[in-house]
C-alpha cells in the first residue's frame, strides 16, 4: 500500500467519489448525502446519470482515480450491476496503489451478507455472475469482502438518517485533515452566506474561477471572506489572504512609492510567492510569477483593495494559476469587478430584522435574544443601527453590561455615528476619489434620500456634477441603491454625509447644507446664512415654532433646494410660525421648493420662479402663488394638495414641460385657467375633492394625459375632452359621463353616485379594462349581463349599492380575481360569476348562507362576510378551499352553524402542511354559534378569534396571568405542541382596526435547573371590535438538533414554563388570561397535516446544520456530569 505521505501529497481533483446503485438510493439517501457534502464545501464527483454499460466509463474511471476518498453505498441492488462491481474493483485498486481511503455504508443491508455474499444480496450477486468468467467472479468477491471488512456505517444502528449523514461528512473532513475552524461558527447568518457563495465558487469545477463579494462598508464582506478562507484553505495546495495589512507589510521598504513602479510590483509579487510556497527567499523576474504558480491549486482572497495595480500584479490572468484555483475579490465597487470581467458576484444584503436583532444580542448579551425587560430597547437600538452588522456589533459591545437606565439615556445619542463606525464608513466616501461623486453623495445624504431618481437628475441637471455617471458610481460602490425608481441611502451612510457637511465650518451658515433643527432655526432667525448654503431640509414635526427673519434668505442667494416638510400630513399638528409681513424674498435660483403648511397667502412678491423644477406646498395657507406670467420651462411637478384657501392657479402657458399637476382638496378653487391647454406634456392631473370647481375650459384636449382624477368634484358642470388613450379615470361623485365618451385604452375606471352602469356605458368602455369600481348609488338594482364583454376584468367593486338584489347568472369572468360587493344590503344570493376569485368581500349583505358551491372557488384566499346579519349557516365545503388564508364572520349575529371540518382525513389530503399557519377565522359577536364546540371540533391547525372574557374550561391549564407552568411533564419527542388560548381586552382605538402580535415562548427545565428556551412562536391578529376577545391557536415547537441534544443523554427535561406576550406597544390592549390544552388531548391531532411526522421544521436539512452545536452541548453535559459526580 502506498504511504500516507504519498497519498496526501497527491493533487486530488475531488474529495469524494460515491459508488452506488441509483435504483436504490439516488433520489433518497444519496441526494441528501451529496447536499450535505456541498454544504460543507466537500467536492464530490457527480456522474450526472452517465449512461451505464458493461465496461467502466473513462470519465468514471478518472473520477475514481482522482478522488481522495471513495464512499461505497452498499444497497440491495448494488450487486445486480456489473457497472457497480467494476467501480468497486477500480476503488480497491486505487486503495492499494496510492492509499485512497474507502468508507463503506450499508444501506438497509446486513454487512455480513456483503462480506460473505449471502442472503438476498448473495442471490442477486450470483445472478449477476452468470455468463461471467470465473476470474471476474473471484475478483468481484474479493473486492466485496475487502471493502465490507472496513469499518463503516450501518444505517440500522442509527436513530435517523440525517444524523448518520452528518457524521459521515464530519468523518470525511477528519480523514482529510480539513476540519473547519471554529472561529466563525457562532457568527449569526454566516452559514447562509457560505452556502450561497458555495454555488458561485463551484468548487467541483476544474476551471480557474474569479468570484466577487460586493456590498457597502460595514455589512460583513470581510467577515464572510475570512470565514470562507478559514474553511477552504486546507482544500488547496496554497492559500493567501491579501488585505491592506499584507500590502503595507510587503511594501515597508518602499514607503512613499506606488505600485506603478516596476520594482514595487516585483517586490509585491515576491511577498505573494513567499506566502504561496511558504519560503522566505524567492528570486523572481519579469514574467516569472505566472510560470511559478501555473501548476499550483491556490485560494487567493483580495480584500477591499480597489487597486487595479494590485490585481494586475497578483492575479491579472486566471491562466496564471493551476486547475481548480479560486480568486475571491472583496470590494464595495461593483464597477471594479465588471472591469476585471468578474461575472460571478455575491451581493451581500442587509440582514433581516430578526437576524439583526440576534446579531445585536450576541454582541450585547452574548446570547441570541435579549432579556425580557430589554426586548423593546434592543429592537430600538437595532433599528437605529439600520441593521448594518458593523453598527450592531459596535453598539452591542458599547452597551454590554450597562444597566437599563443608561440604555434609555443613551438612545438619543445613538442617532450619531460611533467613532469606529464613522471611521469605517468614511473609507468608502474617501474611496470615491472624485469631487463630483463626493458632492452627489452629500446632496443625497442631506437633501435627496428617498426621492425619485428621475427627479434627482432633473434637480441636478445644471450642476455640472455629471449626475448619471456619479449615481452609477455610487450604486456600484454600494453607497446608495435604487429601488423602483427611488434612491435610498442607508441611515448610517446618510449620517456620515451629514457629519461631513458639519465639519465644513463651525458656523452653520457657512456650510453647503443645513440639516439640523438647531442650526436651521439659528440661521433663519438671526439671518446668518451665506452664499455657501445650497440646501436646507427641515422636518417641521420636530419643532413647535419657527422664527424666520424678514431677510433670512437674502444672504443665501445660491440656495437651490428648500425642503420644509412634514411626513404626517394626516395629523393636524400646530406650528407657530413667526413670519414677518415684510418677508419678501426667496432666492431666484431655487430649483426645489417644498414648503408644507406654508403660512402666508402668497409667495414673496420678489420671488422669480423661473428656475423651479419641483414646487410642492401641501396644506398651505396660499390663496394664490404669484401674479403675472413667468417663464416656467423647467417646472415638471406642481403639488398644492390640501391648500383649501387656494382660489386661483397662475397662468401656466409657459410651463410647457409640466408633467404632474396635483390640486386635490383645493376646495376654494372654482376654475382652471385656460392656459392648461398649453400643457402638452401633462400626464397626471388630480383635481379630486375640489368641491367648488365648476368649470374646466372647453376645447382642451391634453393629448399626453394618462391619469385623470375628478372624484368628488360635485359642482363640476362641464367636462374637458378626455383623451381616448387615457388609462386611469376616477369620476366618482361627479356629473354624468359625457355621451360621446370613448375610452379605447382605459385600464381602470372609478364611478359612483349619479352615474348609471347601463349597457350604453358598457359599450363606451374598452374591453381591456382591468378594474371597475362603482359605488354609493342607491338607484342601481342590477348589473347588466354585457359586463361579460369585459373579458380582461380582474377587479370588480360594486359597493354600497343598497338596492342591488342579484348579479347576472350564466356568465364566467375568467380573469376576475377580486370581487367586492360590500354594503349591498339587499343582495341575497351568493355570487356566481367567476370561479377564479381569490378575494371576495360580501360584508354587510343580506346573504343567508355560504352554499355548497363555495368549493368551486378553489383559489379563494380571503372571504369577508363581516356584518351579514341574515347569515344562518356556513357550508362545511368551505373546508375544501386549500388556499384559504382568512375568513371573517364577525357580527353575523344569526349564525348558528359553521362546521369547518368535514372529513378530517379528506382535508389532510387536500390541504398542504404549510398552509395552516396562515388560516385565520373571525367569529367575534356570533352569539348564537356554539363557540366551545367550534374550538373542540377543530382537528387541524387554525387561528380563531372569538368573543369572550375568560378562557373556556376546555383548556385544561388556565390562568389569569400571562404564563403557565407545567412542573411534571415528559418532553421526549421531537416536538412540543399544544393548543393555546389568550384573553385579549381591547379598551378603545381610534383607527378602523387594531392589529396585534402574540408571541409564545417555552422554557424547558431539568431537575438540576439547567434550561433552554425555544424560539418564539409568532401569531398576528387583527380586530375591529372592542371588548374581550378569545384568541385560539395551535403552537408547534419542532426540535432541531440544537434542541434534541438537550433531550437525550443524562438529563430529563420534565418542567416547561410557557410565556404568552403581546409584542405591540399599545396601551389599548391588555392580555388578561391564557390557557393551553396539550396536543395529546386534542382530537385527532396525530392526523393533522402539521403533525410531527411530516412537520417541515423537523427535517434532515435543519438537523444537519446543528452538528457543531450538538457536539459542544454534549461536551458541556459531560463536564456538568463530572462535577455532579465529584460532589
Swiss-Prot record:
The active site is at 87. GO terms for biological process: defense response to bacterium; signal transduction. It comes from the Eukaryota. Keywords: Acetylation, ATP-binding, Hydrolase, Leucine-rich repeat, NAD, Nucleotide-binding, Plant defense, Repeat. The lineage of its organism: Eukaryota, Viridiplantae, Streptophyta, Embryophyta, Tracheophyta. Ecotype cv. Columbia does not respond with a hypersensitive response to hopA1. It catalyses: NAD(+) + H2O = ADP-D-ribose + nicotinamide + H(+). This is Disease resistance protein RPS6. Residues 12-176 form the TIR domain. LRR repeats lie at residues 197-221, 540-563, 587-609, 610-632, 633-656, 658-679, 680-704, 766-790, 791-813, 814-834, 835-857. Pfam families: LRR_3 (PF07725), NB-ARC (PF00931), TIR (PF01582), WHD_ROQ1 (PF23282). The modification N-acetylmethionine is found at residue 1. InterPro entries: AAA+_ATPase, Apaf_helical, Disease_R_plants, Leu-rich_rpt_3, LRR_dom_sf, NB-ARC, P-loop_NTPase, TIR_dom. The TIR domain mediates NAD(+) hydrolase (NADase) activity. Self-association of TIR domains is required for NADase activity. The keyword ATP-binding applies. Interacts with EDS1. Disease resistance (R) protein that specifically recognizes the hopA1 type III effector avirulence protein from Pseudomonas syringae. Resistance proteins guard the plant against pathogens that contain an appropriate avirulence protein via an indirect interaction with this avirulence protein. That triggers a defense system including the hypersensitive response, which restricts the pathogen growth. GO terms for molecular function: ADP binding; ATP binding; ATP hydrolysis activity; NAD+ nucleosidase activity, cyclic ADP-ribose generating. Its EC number is 3.2.2.6. It comes from Arabidopsis thaliana. Ubiquitous. Residues 191-452 form the NB-ARC domain.
Amino acid at each position: 500500500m502506498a504511504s500516507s505521505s504519498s497519498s496526501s501529497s497527491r493533487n486530488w481533483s475531488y474529495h469524494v467519489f460515491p459508488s452506488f446503485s441509483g435504483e436504490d438510493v439516488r433520489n433518497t439517501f444519496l441526494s441528501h448525502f451529496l447536499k450535505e457534502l456541498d454544504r460543507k464545501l466537500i467536492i464530490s464527483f457527480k456522474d450526472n446519470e452517465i449512461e451505464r454499460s458493461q465496461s467502466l466509463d473513462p470519465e468514471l474511471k478518472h473520477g475514481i482515480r482522482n478522488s481522495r476518498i471513495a464512499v461505497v453505498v452498499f444497497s440491495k441492488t448494488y450487486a445486480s450491476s456489473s457497472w457497480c462491481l467494476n467501480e468497486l474493483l477500480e476503488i480497491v485498486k486505487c486503495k492499494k496503489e496510492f492509499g485512497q481511503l474507502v468508507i463503506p455504508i450499508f444501506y438497509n443491508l446486513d454487512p455480513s451478507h456483503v462480506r460473505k455474499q449471502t442472503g438476498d444480496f448473495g442471490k442477486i450477486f450470483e445472478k449477476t455472475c452468470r455468463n461471467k468468467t470465473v476470474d471476474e467472479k473471484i475478483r468481484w468477491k474479493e473486492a466485496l469482502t475487502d471493502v465490507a471488512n472496513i469499518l463503516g456505517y450501518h444505517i440500522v444502528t442509527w436513530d435517523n438518517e440525517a444524523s448518520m449523514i452528518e457524521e459521515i461528512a464530519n468523518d470525511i473532513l477528519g480523514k482529510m485533515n480539513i476540519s473547519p475552524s471554529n472561529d466563525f461558527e457562532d457568527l449569526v447568518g454566516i452559514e447562509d452566506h457560505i452556502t450561497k457563495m458555495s454555488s458561485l465558487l463551484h468548487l467541483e469545477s476544474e476551471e480557474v474561477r474569479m468570484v466577487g463579494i460586493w456590498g457597502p462598508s460595514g455589512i460583513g464582506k470581510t467577515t464572510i471572506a475570512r470565514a470562507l478562507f478559514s474553511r477552504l484553505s486546507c482544500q488547496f495546495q496554497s492559500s493567501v489572504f491579501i488585505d491592506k495589512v499584507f500590502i503595507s507589510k510587503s511594501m515597508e521598504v518602499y514607503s512613499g512609492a506606488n505600485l506603478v513602479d516596476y520594482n514595487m510590483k516585483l517586490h509585491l509579487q515576491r511577498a505573494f510567492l513567499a506566502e504561496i510556497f511558504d519560503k522566505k527567499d524567492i528570486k523572481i523576474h519579469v514574467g516569472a510569477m505566472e510560470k511559478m504558480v501555473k501548476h499550483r491549486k491556490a485560494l487567493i482572497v483580495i480584500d477591499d483593495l480597489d487597486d487595479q495595480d494590485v490585481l494586475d500584479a497578483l492575479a491579472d490572468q486566471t491562466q496564471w494559476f493551476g486547475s481548480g484555483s479560486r480568486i475571491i475579490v472583496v470590494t464595495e465597487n461593483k464597477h471594479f469587478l465588471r472591469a476585471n470581467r468578474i461575472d460571478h458576484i455575491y451581493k451581500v444584503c442587509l440582514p433581516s430584522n430578526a437576524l439583526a436583532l440576534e446579531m445585536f444580542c450576541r454582541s450585547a448579551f452574548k446570547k441570541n435574544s435579549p432579556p425580557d425587560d430589554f426586548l423593546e430597547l434592543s429592537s430600538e437600538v437595532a433599528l437605529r443601527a439600520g441593521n448594518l452588522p458593523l453598527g450592531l456589533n459596535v453598539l452591542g459591545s458599547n452597551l454590554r453590561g450597562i444597566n437599563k437606565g443608561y440604555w434609555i439615556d443613551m438612545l438619543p445619542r445613538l442617532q450619531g455615528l460611533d467613532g469606529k463606525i464613522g471611521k469605517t464608513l468614511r473609507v468608502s466616501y474617501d474611496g470615491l476619489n472624485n469631487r463630483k461623486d463626493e458632492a452627489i453623495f452629500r446632496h443625497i445624504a442631506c437633501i435627496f434620500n428617498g426621492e425619485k431618481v428621475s427627479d434627482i437628475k432633473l434637480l441636478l441637471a445644471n450642476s455640472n456634477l455629471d449626475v448619471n455617471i456619479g449615481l452609477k458610481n455610487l450604486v456600484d460602490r454600494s453607497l446608495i441603491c435604487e429601488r423602483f425608481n427611488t434612491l435610498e441611502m442607508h441611515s448610517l451612510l446618510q449620517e456620515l454625509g451629514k457629519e461631513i457637511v458639519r465639519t465644513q465650518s463651525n458656523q452653520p451658515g457657512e456650510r453647503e447644507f443645513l440639516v439640523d433643527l438647531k442650526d436651521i432655526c439659528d440661521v433663519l432667525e438671526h439671518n446668518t446664512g451665506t452664499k455657501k448654503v445650497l440646501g436646507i431640509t427641515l422636518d417641521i414635526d420636530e419643532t413647535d415654532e419657527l422664527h424666520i427673519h424678514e431677510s433670512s434668505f437674502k444672504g443665501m442667494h445660491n440656495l437651490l433646494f428648500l425642503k420644509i416638510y412634514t411626513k404626517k400630513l394626516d395629523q393636524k399638528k400646530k406650528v407657530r410660525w413667526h413670519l414677518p409681513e415684510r418677508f419678501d424674498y426667496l432666492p431666484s435660483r431655487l430649483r426645489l421648493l417644498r414648503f408644507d403648511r406654508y403660512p402666508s397667502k402668497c409667495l414673496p412678491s420678489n420671488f422669480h420662479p423661473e428656475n423651479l423644477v419641483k414646487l410642492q406646498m401641501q396644506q398651505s395657507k396660499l390663496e394664490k402663488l404669484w401674479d403675472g406670467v413667468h417663464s416656467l420651462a423647467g417646472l415638471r411637478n406642481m403639488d398644492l394638495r390640501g391648500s383649501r384657501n387656494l382660489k386661483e392657479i397662475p397662468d401656466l402657458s409657459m410651463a410647457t414641460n409640466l408633467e404632474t399637476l396635483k390640486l386635490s382638496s383645493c376646495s376654494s378653487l372654482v376654475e382652471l385657467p385656460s392656459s392648461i391647454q398649453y400643457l402638452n406634456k401633462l400626464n397626471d392631473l388630480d383635481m379630486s375633492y375640489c368641491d367648488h370647481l365648476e368649470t374646466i375650459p372647453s376645447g382642451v384636449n391634453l393629448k399626453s394625459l394618462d391619469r385623470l382624477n375628478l372624484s368628488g368634484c360635485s359642482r363640476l358642470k362641464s367636462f374637458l375632452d378626455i383623451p381616448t388613450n387615457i388609462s386611469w379615470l376616477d369620476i366618482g361623485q361627479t356629473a354624468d359621463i359625457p355621451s360621446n365618451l370613448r375610452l379605447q385604452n382605459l385600464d381602470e375606471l372609478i364611478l359612483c353616485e349619479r352615474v348609471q352602469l347601463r349597457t350604453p356605458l358598457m359599450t363606451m368602455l374598452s374591453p381591456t379594462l382591468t378594474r371597475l369600481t362603482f359605488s354609493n348609488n342607491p338607484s342601481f338594482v342590477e348589473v347588466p349581463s354585457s359586463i361579460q364583454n369585459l373579458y380582461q376584468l380582474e377587479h370588480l367593486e360594486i359597493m354600497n349599492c343598497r338596492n342591488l338584489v342579484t348579479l347576472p347568472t350564466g356568465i364566467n369572468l375568467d380573469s376576475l380575481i377580486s370581487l367586492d360587493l360590500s354594503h349591498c344590503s339587499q343582495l341575497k344570493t351568493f355570487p356566481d360569476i367567476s370561479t377564479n376569485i381569490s378575494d371576495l368581500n360580501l360584508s354587510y349583505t343580506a346573504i343567508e348562507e355560504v352554499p355548497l358551491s363555495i368549493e368551486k372557488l378553489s383559489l379563494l384566499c380571503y372571504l369577508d362576510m363581516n356584518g351579514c346579519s341574515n347569515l344562518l349557516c356556513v357550508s362545511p365545503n368551505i373546508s375544501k378551499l386549500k388556499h384559504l388564508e382568512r375568513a371573517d364572520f364577525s357580527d353575523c349575529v344569526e349564525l348558528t352553524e359553521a362546521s369547518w371540518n368535514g372529513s378530517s382525513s379528506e382535508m389532510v389530503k387536500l390541504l398542504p402542511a404549510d398552509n395552516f399557519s396562515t388560516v385565520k377565522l373571525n367569529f367575534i359577536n356570533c352569539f348564537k354559534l356554539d363557540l366551545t364546540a367550534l374550538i373542540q371540533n377543530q382537528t387541524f391547525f387554525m387561528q380563531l378569534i372569538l368573543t369572550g372574557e375568560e378562557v373556556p374550561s376546555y383548556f385544561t391549564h388556565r390562568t389569569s396571568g400571562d404564563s403557565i407552568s407545567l412542573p411534571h411533564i415528559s418532553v421526549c419527542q421531537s416536538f412540543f405542541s399544544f393548543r393555546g388560548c389568550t384573553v385579549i381586552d381591547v379598551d378603545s382605538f381610534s383607527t378602523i382596526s387594531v392589529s396585534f402580535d402574540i408571541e409564545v415562548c417555552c422554557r424547558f427545565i431539568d431537575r438540576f435547573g439547567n434550561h433552554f428556551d425555544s424560539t418564539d412562536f409568532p401569531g398576528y391578529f387583527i380586530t375591529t371590535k372592542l371588548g374581550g376577545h378569545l384568541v385560539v391557536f395551535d403552537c408547534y415547537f419542532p426540535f432541531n438538533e440544537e434542541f434534541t441534544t438537550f433531550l437525550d443523554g443524562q438529563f430529563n427535561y420534565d418542567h416547561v414554563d410557557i410565556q404568552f406576550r403581546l409584542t405591540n406597544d399599545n396601551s389599548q390592549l391588555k392580555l388578561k388570561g391564557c390557557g393551553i390544552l396539550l396536543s395529546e388531548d386534542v382530537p385527532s391531532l396525530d392526523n393533522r397535516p402539521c403533525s410531527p411526522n411530516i412537520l417541515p421544521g423537523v427535517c434532515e436539512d435543519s438537523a444537519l446544520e446543528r452538528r457543531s452545536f450538538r457536539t459542544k452541548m454534549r461536551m458541556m453535559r459531560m463536564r456538568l456530569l463530572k462535577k455532579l459526580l465529584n460532589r
